[in-house]
Amino acid sequence: MNTELTELVFILDRSGSMGGLESDTIGGFNGMIAKQKAQGKKVNVTTILFDDEVDIIHDRFPVEIIEPLTEKEYFVRGCTALLDAVGTAIEKMENVQKHLPEDHRAGKIIFVITTDGLENSSEHFTQEQIRRKIEAKKERGWEFLFLGANIDAGREAEKIGIARNRSVTYENDSKGVELNFKAVGRAISKAVESDAVMDFMDEHWADEIQAYKEGKK
């Protein structure tokens, strides 16, 4: 295992209900990637955009070569095939890690899932299949963060095997999206710096997102 290598997998909702937040999502993502570049650590990035289709735009790219996300890649449309996006991402990473030499396998694997609505159009994976996959990967040290708007993110995360303390319900507005990416960026930076290969996530990663959400009530 290469304890200096981190695999980041971003699964970003671009379904039609994200309309109006395109520039915030693009800017937040680009800012987060810039932070990882500046950190200078060995990080590979996979980025998956989903609506009723699943589109892989970065396939384990070294973070230093990632070009800024633009409206050419991130544009809203369609429904929410969340389970298909997560299942595709897990199977892809699982297959890669399985076939790499032991000393090339990542010491840390972190999935970041964002959605602003409930699953409504997956065709290839069921909720139970995803739950089993995630629970199996968590036993091997993989981390999963789940950020959801317009839903009870904790409840929806638990349905697919992600603990409540790895989930947060965010406010689906410009500030809420901005805080999402900042919080995730900080959490990832701390994880990348950590020497641990298990339990390396900051337990308070979502505090600022939650505080903003509560303040909007």
Predicted feature descriptions by range:
Residues 1-217:
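Acidic, low-complexity intrinsically disordered regions
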